[in-house]
């Protein structure tokens, strides 16, 4: 499995974010996007996820046709946790599993993996910032997709939460998955760096 981008150009709000950008990443590999604020790290993740259309260039998954959608093979974890405050931890994950079209999976196992078993029936509105981030991370586990696109994934996590997420990422890579992450902090896993934009 591999994912590549060629000649990518991104324009947002009439401003060119980047042009001529390319990348390649293979299954079992983590790619860390680094660069100053506004360099285009989040924009690249959103292009790959299909949330933005490139002004030029192509993104290809697994050697297929350039127009093959990557979105159906990828999870995108953005800055916002995208939770429904009135729904419980379990209900939020059930919603996302149905929305993403996943096969039935073990929701309690996903909740346990992120350390929220004690809060499984608690509404998301009552969770701390770190707990909300862990619940958001649990979405990666309820529907199996080979590509994880992560935007500052460890924000709001304490040291213990970062270590637990590092183990989840390591397991994903060991199973042949691929991770592309925009981050200002160490991911806690071995990752190849790709700098976007001029050095800060």
UniProtKB/Swiss-Prot annotation:
Lipid bilayer topology: Peripheral membrane protein
Q: Name one GO biological process term.
A: cytochrome complex assembly
Q: Name one GO cellular component term.
A: plasma membrane
> InterPro entries recorded for this chain?
AAA+_ATPase, ABC_transporter-like_ATP-bd, ABC_transporter-like_CS, ABC_transptr_haem_export_CcmA, P-loop_NTPase
The EC number(s) given in the record are: 7.6.2.5
Q: What class of enzyme is it?
A: translocase
**Which UniProt keywords are given for this protein, alphabetically ordered?**
ATP-binding, Cell inner membrane, Cell membrane, Cytochrome c-type biogenesis, Membrane, Nucleotide-binding, Translocase, Transport
Q: Name one GO molecular function term.
A: ATP binding
Taxonomic superkingdom: Bacteria
Q: What is its main location?
A: membrane
Keyword Membrane on this protein? Answer: yes
Q: Which SMART domains match?
A: AAA
Where in or outside the cell it occurs: the entry states: Cell inner membrane
| UniProt entry tagged with the keyword Cell wall biogenesis/degradation | no
Its recorded reaction(s) are: heme b(in) + ATP + H2O = heme b(out) + ADP + phosphate + H(+)
PANTHER family given in the database record = ABC TRANSPORTER I FAMILY MEMBER 1
Subunit-level organization = The complex is composed of two ATP-binding proteins (CcmA) and two transmembrane proteins (CcmB).
Family from the record = Belongs to the ABC transporter superfamily. CcmA exporter (TC 3.A.1.107) family.
What does the UniProt record say this protein does? Part of the ABC transporter complex CcmAB involved in the biogenesis of c-type cytochromes; once thought to export heme, this seems not to be the case, but its exact role is uncertain. Responsible for energy coupling to the transport system.
This protein's name: Cytochrome c biogenesis ATP-binding export protein CcmA
């Amino acid at each position: 499995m591999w994912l590549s981008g060629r000649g990518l150009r991104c324009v947002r709000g009439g401003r060119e974010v980047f042009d001529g950008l390319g990348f390649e990443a293979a299954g079992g590999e983590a790619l860390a996007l680094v660069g100053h604020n506004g360099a285009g790290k989040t924009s690249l993740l959103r292009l790959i996820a299909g949330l933005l259309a490139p002004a030029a260039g192509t993104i290809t998954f697994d050697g297929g046709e350039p127009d093959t959608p990557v979105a159906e093979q990828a999870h995108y974890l953005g800055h916002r946790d995208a939770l429904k405050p009135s729904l419980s931890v379990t209900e939020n994950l059930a919603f996302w599993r149905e929305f993403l079209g996943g096969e039935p999976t073990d929701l309690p196992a996903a909740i346990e993996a992120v350390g929220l078993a004690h809060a499984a029936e608690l509404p998301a509105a009552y969770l701390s910032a770190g707990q909300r981030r862990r619940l958001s991370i649990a979405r990666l586990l309820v529907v199996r997709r080979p590509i994880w696109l992560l935007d500052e994934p460890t924000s709001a996590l304490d040291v213990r939460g970062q270590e637990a997420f590092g183990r989840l990422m390591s397991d994903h890579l060991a199973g042949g998955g691929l991770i592309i992450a925009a981050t200002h902090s160490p991911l806690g896993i071995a990752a190849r760096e790709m700098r976007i934009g001029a050095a800060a």
